[in-house]
Amino acid sequence: MTNGNSSREIILDILLEILEKGGYSHIVLGQALSKYQYLDKQERAFISRTVEGTVEYTLQLDYVINSYSSVKVKKMKPVIRTLLRMSVYQILYMDRVPDSAVCNEAVKLAQKRKFTGLKGFVNGVLRNISRNKEQLKWPDDSVRYSMPSWILDMWKGTYGEETAVSMVKAFLKPSRTAVRCNLNRASKQEIMESLKNQVVTVEETPLSAAVLYLSKYDYLESLDAFAEG
């Protein structure tokens, strides 16, 4: 498979399983990455980021779509709703993907999924959002940070507005994975070298000599150091 419609079709299926069927995002995504482990790292990273970002920003994405669509998100077909969500996420948050490519691939995917009659609708909504994305204004912090208002209100009441907003921002930052090294199998330096050889970003922590923070990897099971214990 090549990056483009094939990767986006994988993303669409993953998000349908998560957002429409209630699947746990880390489990569904992990299973998909394991199934498609023959894809190159760039494609898997594209899949991971788009899936995770779309799930995290669903509340905000729905607000944007509703602002530029004649049909509200809740009334859309699941495939179209999901296709728009993942595409709008790319338009708003993935600068390396040209908006024109996002729109074109979404139209192709709508057609491939037998929604030929809605190609114009998908194209119109996405291009309208693309043209106006710099003028987007958020009505409140719930939409701005894509956090349910009841949670945000509870945190503000408990911790104060400034701390609550800081907590929400922290949730939206790219996450790192903490792993404990099995120093009976290899030295910490050997484990770090193995990880770096697979182009994983590795950070040490002063909190524990046996713990490493990992980022910019596909999934743990794909790492040699993880597979070797």
Residue ranges, per PLM feature:
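Non-catalytic accessory regions of SAM-dependent methyltransferases
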Residues: 1-131, 138-141
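Glycine-rich nucleotide cofactor-binding entry segment
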Residues: 131-229
